[in-house]
Amino acid sequence: MVKYGLCCISNVLTEQRKLKFSIMRYNQYCKLGHDAALPIIAERTENNLLVTEQIIKLCASKGWTYRVSSCLFPLLTYKHAKFEYHDMPNWVKLDEIFLRIANFVCDNNVRISCHPDQFNVLASNNPDVVDRTVIELEHHGWMMDKLGGDRSHNTPINIHPATSKGDPADISKRFYEAFQRCSPRVQSRLVVE
């Protein structure tokens, strides 16, 4: 049986309801300064969660799966931006939206997944890349928990091996060692494509 799904955005919702994701680039953040940028990031994050909620409802109405956008949280995992989820002034409201989405996902049996960006390489021979990848994967695991996804391959975090440097046995060893650094919320969901 073929199962349809939606990847990140819905052109229909964008056209009909003007619902679209909002981002902030690091250069904008720097121009504004941290104190001015943080409320804007918080507002855009709230918008992104509300758009996600509407897309998930659309997917549920059609029996589709949904691949969650990796851009819900502008700059949250970017090390130079230096802020945490709970630093956003509206984090309590964000938690309420997350809970609403999680309840909907569970009540309607909506299958969700995510696919962190291609720069995430667990088998890299560059320790900085592996460190950043683990941070990104942990963020995605946290996000999938908040969205109500179960900790299984039914709610996958999908990545590519994305390296060809070295002997296949060495690549496998590096991947396994980096995988061991990940928490259960990542390990239980990680799928390699």
Model-derived segments and their meaning:
Residues 90-193:
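Active-site acidic/histidine proton-transfer and metal-coordination neighborhood
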Residues 1-111, 120-131, 146-149:
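Alpha/beta catalytic barrel-like cores
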